[in-house]
């Protein structure tokens, strides 16, 4: 049984790990990792962690069997190549054309699509916001070391 999921996986955290461990309870796990250009097509900022490093970290996880980047915002090609039995999507999965296309393809192939909920306490965005907030607070309370 092959389980496929996709994402950015920037600042790999316990929420990502929970998702991947869940996928692994269903079968062997294949992960599609969005390239910076793909992420930038729907988010204002590119990932902090380089694509190659995100791939390397995911490959190091024992619950992940296959890691492959994707360079276009479409999932049908990867699903045709990998032939997953199950496709895992997040609760923020929208109704954009690329999402509907892969849903239609998978349904036509008799494949299962499972939607999972995210942990509201853990997200890459929240981690980034915390870091920014702490930096701003630090700069507010401390004089810069170097002055011009």
What are these regions (language model features)?
Residues 1-148:
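Nucleotidyltransferase catalytic core that binds NTPs
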């Amino acid at each position: 049984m092959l389980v496929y999921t996709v994402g950015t996986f920037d600042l790999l955290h316990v929420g990502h790990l929970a998702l991947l461990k869940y996928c692994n309870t269903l079968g062997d796990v294949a992960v599609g990792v969005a390239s910076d250009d793909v992420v930038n097509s729907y988010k204002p900022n590119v990932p902090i962690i380089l694509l190659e490093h995100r791939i390397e970290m995911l490959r190091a996880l024992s619950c992940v069997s296959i890691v492959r980047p994707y360079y276009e915002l479409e999932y049908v090609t990867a699903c045709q190549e990998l032939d997953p039995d199950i496709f895992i999507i997040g609760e923020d999965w929208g109704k954009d054309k690329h999402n509907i296309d892969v849903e239609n393809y998978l349904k036509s192939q008799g494949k299962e699509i499972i939607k999972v909920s995210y942990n509201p306490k853990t997200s890459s965005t929240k981690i980034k916001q915390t870091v920014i907030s702490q930096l701003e607070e630090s700069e507010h309370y401390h004089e810069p070391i170097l002055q011009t």
